[in-house]
Amino acid sequence: MNKTLNWLYEHWMKGTPFLALYTFVLIWLYVRGNDYALYLIWLQCPAYWFHEFEEYVCPGGFLSFFNQGPLGSTRPDKPLTKAGSFWINIPLMYVLLPLSGVLSNYFGTDWGFWTAYYSTLNASAHVVMFFIFGRKYNPGLVASVLVNIPLGIYTIWYFLSNGLVSTEVNIQSIIVGIVAQASMMVYGFAYLVPTSKKEGYHKSVYKV
């Protein structure tokens, strides 16, 4: 079991380009023409997997950047480890996002509208980091600017301008999107940063 998990920790991200392309082709062929709103919900999945391809594979380096940048670590591999990254990404990006698409298919797109807000918020964080950390590239920035943010904003505009969601559902979707993004930030800054300080490899501790 440990060998299997260790293999997954090392290689899970390598399937992202194939998964993104395969999923995009399927939803383009079988969903787009039948239900465009549902298509936009499903499209958040391959868009985000493409985003992760940039973060972790080509050019990659997101763990190193995030640890030594936002988390203030002196180490590229801690406090956010490969295992930690796996358990953050898999439940949210590979379970919750597709599940929202499935639920939207059977029970209505209200169930998946939150993904557009989440995608926009998460991608916007890369733009914020670009300005905070010396206007330098961070892994995931290109996909965020060219794919995730435009797609997220367009999806929100399309749903609102066509009256596809009620005010209540819109507010609920905003809240869920914020909570999803905030949960990752809380884990990073309320748990991982204190951990790095406690274990002595945070920059503030290192300088002392």
Protein language model regions, located:
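Small-residue-rich segments of transmembrane alpha-helices in multi-pass membrane proteins
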Residues: 139-155, 206-208
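Core segments of transmembrane alpha-helices
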Residues: 17-23, 84-102, 122, 147-153
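Hydrophobic alpha-helical transmembrane segments in multi-pass integral membrane proteins
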Residues: 148-169
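Short, hydrophobic transmembrane alpha-helix segments
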Residues: 25-38
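Short, highly charged, low-complexity non-transmembrane loops/tails of multi-pass membrane proteins
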Residues: 195-208
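Membrane-proximal helix-loop-helix units in multi-pass membrane proteins
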Residues: 92-146
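The first (N-terminal) embedded transmembrane alpha-helix
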Residues: 9-28
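Juxtamembrane helix-capping/reentrant segments at transmembrane boundaries
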Residues: 65-88
